[in-house]
């Protein structure tokens, strides 16, 4: 029996190279080996201020990227979180057993809420509980995530343990966390100490998957390096050039040693020019397919509804099992 994999991307903004290398490319490989559920986290998206039209476009855009990158809806279950109401239902049940102190320790809330946490919405504070519900509802064996989500996954495991101990029965599966080594954390092109992000105010901090070839060349040409004139890898002292090398090796699948040797006497100009071409070679087919899919909204909606229908079968079983243990009438 195949193990179950669950993961998703928040439906806000445009997906970028970091999303592709850190998540989606790995999912495409996993779909042949596992029973996969990949969702669009649109309920998570409204924990921050977002216009209705922007949310709608983001949902369709993320789905189009999933498909353009190679996820096959005949092999995996792809759905929007909001279309499976059981996610919110299980999240409430989990909220009722999750200690407040656990949530207060979550570092991402502090980062996203900023200096005035009193004005942040409750949804942002309890975001990790909904994330736990997203995972536990499908009894996922494996959850591939980035390093920045590791704390939330540990909370998910703790919440599953609370439920199982409370009812003295293994109702919820405690998932394993999968964090890949290379490509899992691509950094900003403007600051090698910050993760590449959709929310960064500077568009030149990231390579969006729908960027055209000229824009990719411009962004890589202007990507921050340092005062040294040679290519070398050291994340501590040279974070920006090390980030560009991580992108290069992730897309070319060449070793760091080989890449560095190739540019030993050529400086940054040639390295950046070649890196831009490697990015274009990898992303252009995805971009072309993405644009084609975005012109067929009817097909995209069909995929979402089909996936949600399939996901709800598994989700409703888990929710009913948990509700029964609480004492609700099923």
Swiss-Prot record:
- Please indicate the residue ranges that the annotation assigns to the motif 'KMSKS' region: 195-199
Q: Where in the cell is it found?
A: Cytoplasm
**What Pfam families does the annotation carry?**
tRNA-synt_1b
Q: Name one cellular component (GO) term.
A: cytoplasm
Reaction catalysed by this chain? tRNA(Trp) + L-tryptophan + ATP = L-tryptophyl-tRNA(Trp) + AMP + diphosphate + H(+)
Listed EC numbers: 6.1.1.2
Q: Might you name a Gene Ontology BP term for this protein?
A: tryptophanyl-tRNA aminoacylation
Quaternary state and interactors? Homodimer.
Q: Which family does the entry's similarity section mention?
A: Belongs to the class-I aminoacyl-tRNA synthetase family.
Identify this protein by name.
Tryptophan--tRNA ligase
GN (gene name) = trpS
């Amino acid at each position: 029996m195949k193990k179950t994999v669950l993961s998703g991307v928040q439906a806000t903004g445009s997906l970028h190279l970091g999303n592709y290398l850190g998540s989606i490319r790995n999912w495409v490989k996993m779909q042949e080996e596992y029973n996969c559920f990949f969702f669009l986290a649109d309920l998570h998206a409204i924990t921050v201020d977002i216009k209705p039209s922007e949310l709608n476009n983001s949902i369709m855009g993320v789905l189009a990227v999933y498909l353009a990158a190679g996820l096959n809806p005949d092999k995996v279950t792809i759905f929007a979180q909001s279309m499976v109401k059981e996610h919110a239902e299980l999240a409430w049940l989990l909220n009722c057993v999750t200690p407040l102190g656990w949530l207060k320790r979550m570092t991402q809330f502090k980062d996203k809420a900023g200096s005035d946490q009193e004005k942040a919405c409750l949804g942002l504070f309890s975001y990790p509980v909904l994330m736990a519900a997203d995972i536990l509802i499908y009894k996922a064996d494996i959850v591939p995530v980035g390093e920045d989500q590791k704390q939330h996954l540990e909370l998910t495991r703790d919440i599953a343990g609370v439920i199982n101990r409370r009812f003295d029965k293994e109702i919820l599966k405690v998932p394993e966390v999968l964090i890949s080594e290379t490509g899992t954390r691509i950094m900003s092109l403007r600051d090698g100490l910050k993760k590449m992000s959709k929310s960064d105010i500077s568009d030149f901090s990231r390579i969006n998957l729908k960027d055209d070839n000229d824009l990719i060349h411009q962004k890589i040409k202007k990507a921050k390096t340092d005062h040294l004139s040679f290519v070398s890898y050291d994340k501590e002292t040279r974070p920006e050039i090390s980030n560009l090398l991580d992108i290069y090796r992730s897309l070319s699948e060449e070793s760091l040693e080989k890449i560095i040797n190739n540019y030993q006497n050529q400086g940054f100009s040639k390295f950046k020019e070649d890196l831009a071409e490697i990015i274009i070679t990898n992303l252009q087919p995805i971009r072309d397919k993405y644009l084609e899919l975005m012109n067929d909204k009817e097909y995209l909606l069909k995929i979402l509804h089909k996936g949600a229908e399939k996901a709800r079968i598994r989700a409703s079983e888990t929710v009913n099992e948990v509700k029964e243990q609480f004492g609700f009438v099923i």
